[in-house]
Amino acid sequence: MEFSERKRSRKSQSFKLVSRDYHHEVYKISEFSNDVNGETKETQPIYLGDESMEIKKQITGMRRLLNDSTGRIYQRVGKEGEKLKQEPQVVDLVWPQRSNSSTEASQGLHSNSRGAWNELPTQSGQFSGQSGPRSRTFQTQPHISASSNGELPGVNSIVGSNCCTCNCQSTLQAILQELKTMRKLMQFQAVGTQNRQQPPISLMCSQRTAVSRKRNKKKKVLPKTVQPVTAVEPKPSPLETEKKPAASATRPPGLQAAERTSTEENHVLGFGIVLESPSSDPEVQLAEGFDVFMPKSQLDSILSNYTRSGSLLFRKLVCAFFDDKTLANSLPNGKRKRGFNDNRKGLDQNIVGAIKVFTENYCTANHVDKLPGPRDWVQILQDQIKLARRRLKRGSAEVADGDERLDRISLPPTGHTFVIKRETPEDPEPGSVA
């Protein structure tokens, strides 16, 4: 009989890892059969040809899938140095050949083979559910085959008859078919449980879109300002149309045309929230969330003249809200400088934030070039502060020059009188010289 040694590799003090080629669970299936008297008896499985070996390999593969995904078998071992050397001679790798100790056993195998194989699916179900060291320790115990007389059957190297091999091939094929059906059932059950746990696709899509919207709202502030503006702005449009006929009688036609174009641009672009006001010129809220308002006519004039670049629009809006004195005595980032002699204060960040949001929305909607970056806003404010200081210096210098000019204009008559006074005492000097 052909034997091959089972390879082992040391895993730990209490476990040994059997190589993946060995699958003791599979070989143990055919070790039980019924005796002639009906008693259970362990018999060695029959060595079959190449076809049967292929079927057995398929069975081992299916059992590997059903039992353990990794295919590893850990066997429990006693304490250190306790019966570790005696284990390799217990189990074989090769499917052993059938023992021909008695002809009655072969007849019993033929007569009761169908009953024995019918019991195998239940055993396979039991083996498929087992996991852990207990089931495997039971498998590693030496199997003592005993006949009805109590004698140990010998192992014979003679191959069984063709009839027996045919019967075993059919039974092996039946086992393989049942294992395949079991695997399909397990897969269907797993898919059914997953489908029960997962919500329907429509709900998943709606949840994902809601989550993505929330994330976008948290990250970006701009869409918040744009969306409500477009929804709120068309409402006051009929009020504006009612106010236009009353104001058109008093205003020239050129201003009326300019206002029409500007209002159309505002309605199309959706910027600024027009608010009702008792005066003829309504106020516009630059951005939602900021209590910053601006006369609509002034905003229309800025949008019609200074929309070449986003930085220019931002500069003009800053100049519209802050005069030169406030800019000259302020800091761009809203913080107070830590100096005892420095009285400068930060700019109102509410106004600056509203202007910034308005320019960003306008430039992105109208595709205006040169939109200021995150670091450019403070630089633009610093430039505007410097320009305001220069204007104040020039204005003070011009005022001083104007005062000097006024003094010069008033000085000649007074100088003339002084010259007359000076000439009177100088008259006797030439007389004295003469």
From Swiss-Prot:
Provide this UniProt record's keywords sorted from A to Z.
Answer: Isopeptide bond, Phosphoprotein, Ubl conjugation
MF terms in GO: DNA binding
Record has Ubl conjugation as a keyword: yes
- The source's superkingdom equals Eukaryota
Where is the cross-link described as Glycyl lysine isopeptide (Lys-Gly) (interchain with G-Cter in SUMO2)? 16, 56, 85, 244
Q: Domain BEN, which positions?
A: 289-399
Show the segment(s) annotated as Disordered. 96-151, 212-262, 414-434
| Modification Phosphothreonine, positions | 326
Q: Which residues form a coiled coil?
A: none
Q: Where is the composition biased (Basic residues)?
A: 212-222
Chain intervals with Polar residues compositional bias:
97-150
Pfam family of the protein (one): BEN
Q: Which parts of the sequence carry Phosphoserine?
A: 330
Q: What is this protein called?
A: BEN domain-containing protein 7
Q: Which organism is it from?
A: Mus musculus (Mouse)
Chain's gene name: Bend7
